[in-house]
Amino acid sequence: VATVCGTRRDFQGYDKAVETLKEAGVIVCENNKLAVHTAIRAIGLDFEEPVKEIRPKTTARIQKTDASEKLLELLSQKPRVINVGLKSFAEVIEAFGCDVVQYDWAPPAGGNVELIKVLNFLRSCREMDIDEANRSVIAKVVASQPVIKDVVPAKSVIKELNEGKVILHAGPPIRFENMPDPVQGSCVGAALFEGWAATEEEARKILASGEVTFIPCHHVKAVGPMGGITSANMPVFVVENQTDGNEAYCTMNEGIGKVLRFGAYSKEVVDRLLWMKDVLGPTLGRAIRSIGGLNVNPLVAKAIAMGDEFHQRNIAASLAFLKEVSPVITKMDMDEKDRYDVIKFLADTDQFFLNIMMATGKAVMDAARQVTDGTIVTAMCRNGVEFGIRISGMGDEWFTAPVNTPQGLYFTGYDGEDVCPDMGDSAITETFGVGGMAMIAAPAVTRFVGAGGYEDALRTSTEMTEITIDRNPNFIIPNWNFQGTCLGIDAR
C-alpha cells in the first residue's frame, strides 16, 4: 500500500509513478490517511476513526506587512535551483526553462559500501595522530633542498645494475611477457645499447629467457620516464636532497622523435644513447661538478612563473638549466664539435628538465617516506598494465589497480583504438605537487593533454585542492592568485 506525493501537474510525472506502482501490484491511495486505513483493513483489523472534537472558530485581526522583495521574486519568477544529487532532477527543472546548477558531488568512494567503511575507520582511528603524521610528511617536502650533484653512469650509483644483466623499468613490478609492446621495445633497445645482442631477434630471445632481471626503478631510488627502461651504462642525473642526505636518479631526456622511452630501438635510437653515454653525460657531469651542484628549487620557482607545470611543459626550466651550465661548457677543454652538439641538443630539447624534475620529486618524496605514519601518497607510477601508489604509513607496499588509457591529441590517422595504456614513473611530479596538479600554471598545453582550455585547467587545479592537505609556499603560481602548488595527496 502506498501513496504518491505531488499532483498531476508535477514535473516528475505523477500519473506515471502511480501507473508504475499499480503495475507492480501496489495499492495506491490518494492520501496517507486512506493508505493507513487500507493497510490496517488488509491485515484483518477493524478501525474506527475517533470522533473529532469540534471547537468554535476563533478569529483575530493581524497587521498586514509588506512582503520582502526576495519573497515576491520567488513567487513571481521562475525558480533558480542548485541541485545536489541525481543529475536527472536538474534535467527536469532545466527542461521547464528554469535556471539550474548541478552541484558536482558524488558519494565517497563512488558509493562502494566497503570502501566507505574503510574511510570511516580511517577518520575515526587515531585521527589526530594521522593528521599530525601527515603534517610531518608535508613539512619534510617543504623543507627539502634538492640539488643536482652530478651525471654519472647508472651502474656507479645503483649497485643492482652490476649484478648480471639487469634492466630497471617504470611502475610497480611486472614480468617481461606482461609488458606492453612499447615497454618491451624499450627493453630491446637497452639490450642492443648494452651489447647483449646484435639484433632484435637476439635481444627478444635473451629478454624472454629469464636471463635478464627486471627491477622497478622505484625499488632502487630511481625513476624512469614512459617505459622507464634504465640499464647499467646509461647516464643518470644524481639529485641529492640535502635536507635529509638521500639521493635519487633518473636517465636524461632523449629529445623528440624516435626515442627509447616510447619503445623505439632503431640504429638512430641506439646511436643517440651511445652519444649521451660518451659525450652528453660526461660533459654535463663535469659542468655540474665544477659549479658545486645546482639548486633545483630556484629553477622550479622561476619556471613555474614562466608557464611550466613540469610534466608536459618544461621549456622555461630547460632553458633556465641551459643558462646555468652553458657558460661552464663554453670554457671546458673539449672537442669543439662535441661542445656545439651538447649546447644544440640542450637548446632543442624542450622537455630536458622533466627528467631532472622526476629525480627531484623522487629524492624529496623518498625523504618524506621516512615518516612511517600517515596517509600521504609518496609515489604514483604506471607500467602499462597497473597503476601503483605508495603511502607514507604503508612502507614499501604497492597498492595497484588496472591502469587507465590517456586521453590526448593523436597524430593524423590514429585514434583511441591505437593507444597504449598509461606508463611511466613521471607521475612522481604530481606526487610532488606539480605536473597535472599545477595545470593552471601552464594553460598553453591544456589542450595537448586532453583538457579543453584555461577554465578546464583552473577547474582541475582547484579540484586537486580537495584531495591535498596543504600548499607549497616555495612554488607560487602567478595566474592562480599567487597561491602555492597543491601539496600532500591524502589517500583518505
PLM segments and residue spans:
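Short, structured coil segments at secondary-structure junctions
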Residues: 22-25, 96
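Short, hinge-like loop/turn segments at secondary-structure boundaries
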Residues: 18-21, 47-48, 119-120
